[in-house]
Amino acid sequence: MLGLGVDRLQADINRLLASLFHQGVLDEQFLQLQQLQDETSPNFVYDVINIYFDESEKLLRNLRLLLMDREFSDYKKIGLHLNQLVGSSSSIGARRVRNVCVAFRSASELSNRPGCLRGLEVVEHEYHYLKNMMHELFQLEQQRILAAGVRYPM
């Protein structure tokens, strides 16, 4: 009986991941991240993604503060924050976040304040979408683990 619930949850996980890949939210780097997870580190992906979210929140907050300062003119500082966000997004396979960061960085290289404000808005939107989808994925995975039951080595 437990197997049916586990199978249904695994199918839900597979559908969600397929959708995220189809939408371009994730890329193959996310699959490589998943392959690093094993029995010795069963929470590896969850931990790495949560570190990404914690660090990204700081970067987004810094970008927002910089752009809210009407006297701001140091667009190189914006570029540095965006480079960090591009790198960390690439490392976890957050394709759409990475892509919109690259577009935002182009606006900062042109010292285009309206373009930067719009870029920040788009990055925040994509970031929050990714965060919500990862939360949903991790909830499904947790339910699948619980449905499978605890197995003790014999």
UniProtKB/Swiss-Prot annotation:
Its keywords, alphabetically, are: Acetylation, Cytokinin signaling pathway, Cytoplasm, Nucleus, Two-component regulatory system
Q: Where is the signal peptide?
A: none
Record keywords: Nucleus included? yes
Q: Which coarse location class describes where this protein primarily resides?
A: cytoplasm
Q: Where is the HPt domain?
A: 41-137
Biological-process GO terms, alphabetical: cytokinin-activated signaling pathway; phosphorelay signal transduction system; response to cytokinin; xylem development
Q: Name the domain of life this protein comes from.
A: Eukaryota
Q: Which InterPro entries match?
A: AHP1-5/YPD1 (IPR045871), HPT_dom_sf (IPR036641), Sig_transdc_His_kin_Hpt_dom (IPR008207)
Modified residue N-acetylmethionine is at which positions? Answer: M1
Give the GO cellular component terms, alphabetically: cytoplasm; cytosol; nucleus
Annotated localization: Cytoplasm, Cytosol; Nucleus
Q: Name one GO molecular function term.
A: protein histidine kinase binding
User: What's the stated role of this polypeptide?
Assistant: Functions as a two-component phosphorelay mediator between cytokinin sensor histidine kinases and response regulators (B-type ARRs). Plays an important role in propagating cytokinin signal transduction.
Q: Self-association or partners: how does it assemble?
A: Interacts with AHK5.
**PANTHER family, from UniProt?**
PHOSPHORELAY INTERMEDIATE PROTEIN YPD1, PSEUDO HISTIDINE-CONTAINING PHOSPHOTRANSFER PROTEIN 6
Q: What is this protein called?
A: Pseudo histidine-containing phosphotransfer protein 6
Which organism does this record belong to?
Arabidopsis thaliana (Mouse-ear cress)
State the encoding gene: AHP6
